Amino acid sequence: MTQAQTLTFTNRTTSPFRYDIVGSFLRPAELKAAREKFANHEIDHDELKAVEDKCIKALVEKQAQAELHAVTDGEFRRSWWHLDTFWGFDGIAHTNPEHGYFFHDEETRADSAQVEGKIRFNGTHPDLEAFKYLKSLTDGTDLIPRQSIPAPAQCYEELVLGEGKSEAIAEFYSSKAELAKDVSQAYHDLILALYDAGCRDLKLDDCTWGSIADDEFWHVFAEDGQSRELLQEQLLKINNDALVNLPADLVVTTHVCRGNYHSTWATKGGYGPVADYVLAKENVAAFYLEYDSERAGGFEPLAKVPADKYVVLGLLTSKSGELEDRQVILDRIQEATQYHDLDKLCLSTQCGFSSTEEGNILTEEQQWAKIALVKSIAEEVWGA
C-alpha cells in the first residue's frame, strides 16, 4: 500500500502542484536555426515570431500530453532566463562586457544590462506579449498558463554589479536606494499588467539567494562593506516591495537557484545562511528549491518556511539525462518531512532544462522522461 493510499492530502488546484516543473525547456533545432538566421539578418522579426509561435504551440501540446497542470512557453522567445526581461524595461540597456558569467568550468556569452535612464515598465514589454500568446493556447482548456520572470532582486544586482555600472547609475539616480525603489515599482507594474492579461500563476526566478548562501561568493554582492544580513534585508525588501497590494487570486511563487548554464553550476552551499530572510519572510506562496546534489546541503532550512507555505523539492537534476533511483527520491522526500509537513511538499526537477538558449546537455526524450519520473513518484507519494 502506498503512502497516498494511507494518508489524505490537500487537492492542489493552484500552484505549486504535486508534480511540477521549473519552466524552461530545450529549444527545438528549428527554433535555434531561426534565431541564428535572425541574428544574421537572414529573416525578419515576423518570420522569427512565426517559428516561435509554432514551437511554443507544439510544446504546450507536449506538456498537456505529460499531464502537467501549469504550462509554460518554455522561455522559447528568450536568449537568457533573466536578461531579456531586464532589457524590456525602459531605462535599461543591453551591454556586452568583456567577460560573461563565470560558471563551474565554463564562461557564458558576454551579455549584461546597465542603467541608461529612469527605469519604468512599458506596455510593450516582451514578457507581456509572450504571455498573451501562451494564454491564447490554453483558453478553453484546464491548463494553467504560468509566467516566469527573474526576480526584482536579480534585476537590481545585474544593474549594480560590474565595471562602469555605478557611474551609469549616478547619471540618473541620486542613490542606489532610489534605483531599488524604481526596480520594485517597474516589476509591480509588470505583474499587474500580466494579471490584467489573465495571468494567475507567476513564478520569480532568483539566483541572488543562491549566491548569498555561498560562503565563498556572497561578498561579491555586498556593497561598501555591507554585512550578509544587511544585504539580505535589502534584497528581501526589493522583492517584497514589488509584491505589495496584488490581487488575492494571483499565485506568486519563487525558484531559488544556484545557476544553470549548459549543465554547469555557479554557486554552492545549503540554504541555511539565507533561510531567516528569503524562506521565512519573502511574500510568496511557495519555494522551488534545488536539492539535486550535495552542493545543496541538507533539509534543515525548511524548518524556517512558514507552516502554511509550500516547498517544491527539486530532487531530480535537469543538468543530465540519467534518471534518478526512484527509491532514493522517495527516501529523500521522507527525510524532508522532518522539517516541513508532507502535505506542504511537492516535487520537481531542480531547475529548468534550458535557462539559456544553449540548453543543458541532454536530449528532448530524456527531458520528458525526467518529467514522467517526477509525475510517477509524486503520484505514489501524494496520489497526485
Spans of features found by a protein language model:
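Domain-level signal for soluble alpha/beta catalytic cores
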Residues: 2-384
